[in-house]
From Swiss-Prot:
Region of interest: Disordered: 1-81, 157-231, 384-416, 466-517, 545-747, 763-857
Compositionally biased spans, kind Basic and acidic residues: 7-16, 36-48, 62-81, 545-572, 648-657, 783-799
Bias (Low complexity): 49-61, 209-230, 384-394, 476-504, 586-604, 621-645, 688-697
Paired cysteines (S-S): none
PANTHER family: PROTEIN SIP5
GO cellular component terms given for this protein: cytoplasm
Location of this chain's protein in the cell: Cytoplasm
Family of this protein: Belongs to the SIP5 family.
Function according to Swiss-Prot or TrEMBL: May negatively regulate the snf-1 kinase.
Compositionally biased spans, kind Polar residues: 179-191, 199-208, 698-712, 800-838, 845-857
Protein name: Protein sip-5
Keywords of the record: Cytoplasm
Species this chain originates from: Neurospora crassa (strain ATCC 24698 / 74-OR23-1A / CBS 708.71 / DSM 1257 / FGSC 987)
InterPro entries: Sip5/DA2
Length: 857
């Protein structure tokens, strides 16, 4: 189409360039030969430019070209596209001025600005054959009330004049003047050109249905001897033979194009008015065209040629999302090859999109030449004037206003033009894409194969260091895998076994018949061994990760448990503090008998109901019975569900050291502590020196101290009277008061011997002088009962509430006051082996006691 002129000019330029190069080469060769002859006598090196046939000044030009920057591929492609665009614009302008088909054009009008990748030569041939509508000029606006000059201006792309304005001369068509019959006869003699015995193509035979309109008018104003004016693309089509395969014969060339006489009228109307007076709109681009448009073969919908040539097959792609249950499914799709489906109709989406065209009832512009045989078989020739006055049309052409067809046409119909016909290179593109994909797959396979082979060779080299070499014998070759298995051990050695088996097969084949295993089998074995190795490695990695996760979870659970225990201890301490009141706030969680009234002076907490010396004497005298009961409590385990007395019900101060959460083995196992001097001032009055436990501690006999190993001895004293008021529930040593001590202070055996009281056996707590005096003991018990009723408030329980698991006998002993109760009225008993200096310090001696005023806290 438009590339013919460019190719011709390019050919001329190449011819000139070849001539100049030949002349330059000749001049250069002659000059160089002179130089060579002049230099032969000097025995110098021949100039290489003479051997290469270069000119004298060519060296400098090529030296300059070396320093020029090379053009990249992108720049070269952009330059090529720009050249094609400029050439296309020039060709469009030339074709629109010189060529047309029935008032339409053979080049696009610029509706779509994208690349024109359709075959322009095929489209040109189809339009000249009247199988495809020409590229009509589309109108953006059209008014049915336009006058003829306005329609002509719009069809030619000129400014539309006003309705009442006088149109310019160029918009007024002028009929041709009648010519002489001699001119007509002379033109008739030159109608045909000898074709040389070749047969016309089928397309050309179909295009001669209206042969009468192809005759030149007698009034032709051309001065040429022949009415036929060959176009520039005719020679190219004849030489290249591009239409040979498309016309059904491999030996034919494209038919010769001829230009019909220029007649600006059709049935007495201007050509533009005849075309655009009944204009229609394209449903795709929404431009107004003449009613002679293409119609789809399936649904008979109008479509312009510019929209039709833009519809094409999709690019080659993988068959994803296609209907696999379709019985017409292509087997190539199941093979995973690239596919390219035919284009579908834009209206009804039916595949194999194609169009048909019904040309207008006249012929103007280009057409193909006809043979004399075809011309003789047609009817008598009609002139253009007779065709203007004639109301009958050619028999083979249907009127566009006729009845529309109500059924679709086959894709193989002769008058159907498919999208694949204007783009015949789709099959080539598909094959190229498949070949490119195959090359990429082959390259990837080669890379993977090389990687597997390298890994396999390295693994075999490593195994050969530890195994026995194969010397070629079948016995040694068969013995090698066994040795290798023994060296490898009992681990998962399946990949090594596979490699050893392959090695054995190769050795046996090379020593025997020389048959080797195929490359595909080796590759499969290597892939199998690699897969097993990767699987084992993945399993080991998974186990390591699982072990790490388990360790993390265990540490996390341990931390959470410790936090929960600390929170529970804090909550229990807070609850005990709230339940016991202000006197319970400083108590330790390890409460025991050390919180009894014996430890009140040292611990500095609790309530003391009796402040008199008599109450102190009672407490001091009841030590023996308390020790006996403590020993029983140590041997008998405490009940786990022992309940402490409620502080709300017993609010008289008798349950000083009883807490709800103090049921522990440590509390029951500890002996009763002895009192110590108070750490600070107290509101209580000073106790008597005769009844004070502190004075006994100062003047106790030498050697009465019991080491820590005798702490659990019921005959020894308990813990020190130093309070554990500041000790936390967990019993940390750092929270303990350093002024206090847990070492025993007294030996109650030596104290009892000095005092004269028995602390063992059935008569524990009795004086030695009163053991045989039953009456005096009974009388002492009566007095104790009477004094217990009156002064019961001064008796403090020694055992804690956690010793609820003690037997009934021990509980009865603990609930009753001791058998020997020393009161203010009891007479002092003299002991013979006791010095007078220490009599005043022992229990039972007369002592002047100052009665202190009782203070209630």
């Amino acid at each position: 189409m438009g590339n013919a002129n460019t190719k011709e000019s390019r050919g001329d330029d190449s011819g000139r360039r070849g001539l100049h190069s030949a002349l330059d080469a000749g001049i250069g060769s002659s000059t160089q030969s002179g130089r060579e002859s002049s230099r032969r006598n000097r025995n110098t090196r021949h100039d290489l430019t003479g051997l290469l046939g270069r000119a004298a000044g060519g060296s400098s030009s090529h030296a300059d070209e070396r320093h020029e920057r090379k053009e990249t591929k992108q720049e070269r492609e952009a330059r090529r596209l720009e050249k094609e665009r400029v050439a296309r614009l020039q060709e469009r302008e030339r074709s629109m001025k010189e060529e047309h088909v029935d008032g339409g054009y053979l080049v696009t009008m610029g509706t779509y600005v994208g690349p024109e990748d359709f075959n322009k030569q095929i489209v040109r041939q189809l339009m000249i054959e009247r199988k495809l509508a020409p590229f009509w000029r589309g109108l953006n606006d059209f008014d049915e009330n336009w006058t003829e000059p306005q329609i002509i201006a719009a069809a030619r792309g000129l400014p539309i004049p006003a309705a009442g304005e006088t149109p310019p001369d160029e918009l007024i068509p002028r009929p041709r003047s009648p010519a002489s019959p001699t001119d007509a006869s002379s033109n008739t003699n030159h109608l045909t050109v000898p074709i040389g015995g070749r047969s016309l193509s089928t397309a050309s035979e179909h295009s001669t249905s209206n042969a009468g309109s192809a005759l030149p008018s007698p009034g032709s104003g051309k001065g040429s001897s022949s009415p036929f004016k060959p176009t520039r693309g005719k020679a190219i089509a004849a030489v290249l033979g591009g239409g040979s395969c498309r016309n059904g014969s491999s030996t034919e060339i494209a038919p010769r194009e001829i230009m019909l006489p220029n007649d600006p009228f059709v049935n007495g109307q201007p050509l533009e008015v005849f075309l655009y007076k009944n204009a229609t709109e394209c449903p795709i681009c929404f431009l107004t065209y003449p009613p002679y448009l293409n119609h789809t073969r399936c649904c008979d919908q109008p479509i312009c040629s510019e929209c039709f040539v833009q519809i094409k097959r999709p690019d080659p792609h993988f068959p994803e999302g296609h209907n696999e249950n379709d019985p017409n499914n292509n087997p190539e799709e199941s093979a995973g090859l690239l596919v390219s489906e035919p284009a579908c109709c834009p209206y009804c989406t039916q595949p194999d999109f194609g169009v048909t065209y019904e040309p207008p009832p006249f012929r103007r512009g280009l057409t193909y030449a006809i043979s004399p045989l075809a011309l003789g078989s047609t009817s008598a020739a009609m002139s253009s004037e007779s065709s203007v006055n004639s109301g009958s049309l050619s028999p083979g052409v249907a009127s566009p206003g006729g009845r529309r067809r109500n059924q679709s046409l086959s894709a193989n119909a002769p008058n159907v033009v498919l999208t694949d016909k204007v783009r015949p290179e789709w099959a080539t593109k598909l094959q190229a894409a498949r070949a490119h994909l195959a090359r990429r797959a082959a390259a990837a396979t080669a890379l993977h194969t090389a990687a597997f082979l390298m890994n396999n060779n390295e693994s075999r080299a490593l195994r050969s260091r530890f195994g026995r070499r194969n010397t070629g014998g079948s016995g040694s070759a068969s013995a090698t895998p066994g040795n290798g298995d023994e060296n490898r051990g009992t681990g998962p050695a399946t990949p090594a076994n596979a490699g050893a088996t392959a090695n054995t097969d190769r050795a046996a084949g090379s020593s025997g018949n020389g048959n080797r295993r195929s490359r595909l089998e080796d590759l499969e074995e290597m892939m199998f061994a690699e897969a097993i190795r990767l699987s084992l490695a993945a399993e080991e990695e998974r186990k390591k990760k699982a072990e790490k996760e388990e360790q993390k979870e265990a540490k996390k659970r341990e931390k959470e448990r410790e936090k929960a225990e600390k929170k529970a201890e804090k909550a229990a301490a807070k609850a005990a503090a709230k339940q016991g009141g202000p006197y319970e706030a400083s108590r330790s969680g390890h409460s025991s008998a050390s919180g009894s009234s014996l430890s009140l002076p040292g611990l500095s907490f609790g309530r003391k109901r009796g402040n008199s010396a008599a109450s102190n004497l009672r407490v001091e005298a009841s030590v023996a019975s308390a020790m006996a009961s403590t020993g029983a409590a140590m041997t008998t385990p405490a009940a786990p569900g022992a309940l402490a007395p409620d502080s709300s019900t017993k609010d008289k101060g008798k349950a000083v050291d009883r807490s709800a959460g103090a049921a522990s083995n440590d509390a029951s196992a500890r002996p009763i502590p002895s009192p110590q001097p108070m750490a600070g001032p107290s509101h209580l009055r000073q106790m008597s020196s005769a009844s004070s436990a502190s004075s006994s501690a100062v003047e106790s006999n030498q050697g009465s101290y019991v080491p820590p190993s005798n702490l659990q001895d019921p005959r020894g004293s308990g813990l020190s009277l130093g309070g554990r008021s500041g000790v936390s529930e967990d019993g940390d040593e750092q929270d303990r008061d350093p002024s206090t001590s847990t070492e025993p202070m007294f030996n109650f055996r030596s104290l009892a011997e000095v005092v004269g009281v028995s602390i063992e056996g059935e008569h524990a707590g009795k004086r030695l002088s009163q053991i045989n005096a039953d009456g005096q003991a009974i009388e002492g018990e009566d007095e104790t009962a009477k004094s217990g009723e009156g002064a019961g408030e001064h008796v403090e329980h020694v055992l804690d509430s956690q010793t609820t698991g003690i037997s009934e006998q021990d509980s009865e002993i603990n609930s009753q006051p001791p058998r020997l109760t020393v009161t203010l009225d009891s007479p002092a008993t003299s002991v013979g082996d006791v010095s007078t200096a220490s009599d005043s310090k022992h229990v039972g001696n007369e002592t002047t006691v100052e009665h202190a005023t009782q203070v209630t806290l």
